[in-house]
């Protein structure tokens, strides 16, 4: 496939990403990826000459998305995460476990598509859209499945930002306790920021930094989760063939790890991590571009038809994470 054949589709996704990005800055609680999916769905309903754009759209939804995940690694200082986030590790492990268990059980009960259930379970438990972006290519998720999972995650991000500060005060969480709660029970990084900022405004505190570090610690779970899912998916789809390490280990996850290691080395040498800021911004913009591509290819009728069960699954994962996060805090004495 010649690169010039991809240019029209890339340009279309770029054009969709620009207003989506601006709307995301104006309404961060909703976020640019959600706007990109919505605009992409509208564009996909009307645009003609699909043959001209399809190759670039496919390239964006797969390879630009994987590049975004790699660039995400430049925001992770592993030493800082291990130093500050290690205390939250038991809570993180338990919340991730309960979300994945709930997703597995309810997928069977609701007879929901396995791919959608996996994306919602991973997105709820790790880091929202970024986790979905990392998982989707590993399990060969379709664009409308990714769009549905992102939409479900977005709904509960909004609810968390609106409800959690009041809930935290009602049950008597300390500032440290709320930072752990927001960092482990809110899906997306931007929503963690919004939730912690709302708490700080009400209580005149400074929980944002702590909540963000806990959230970054959760992000590292992308690595083992994608590898395990890759092994499982490969064994399911290639039962007759041998499964090698080179086949099951997603290359973009390796590059994500290398980017994180480079960030850690640069930080340990005393350099400011602001030099990576453009790459972090580019990562977010690439995710928006990819969500635009996914929106274009989304089957709206299927999205509406299966949306109810997906929302119920997302609600169950979300409530399970809330209960486990608060229960673990009570047990560990971090309330």
From Swiss-Prot:
Main location: membrane
Xref: Pfam families: Cons_hypoth698 (PF03601)
GO cellular component: plasma membrane
UniProt key word Transmembrane: yes
Taxonomic superkingdom: Bacteria
Membrane-spanning ranges: 20-42, 57-79, 84-106, 116-138, 151-173, 210-232, 253-275, 285-304, 311-333
Membrane topology, as annotated: Multi-pass membrane protein
Signal sequence coordinates: none
Subcellular location: Cell membrane
Keywords: Cell membrane, Membrane, Transmembrane, Transmembrane helix
Family label: Belongs to the UPF0324 family.
Protein name according to UniProt: UPF0324 membrane protein SAG1125
Protein species of origin: Streptococcus agalactiae serotype V (strain ATCC BAA-611 / 2603 V/R)
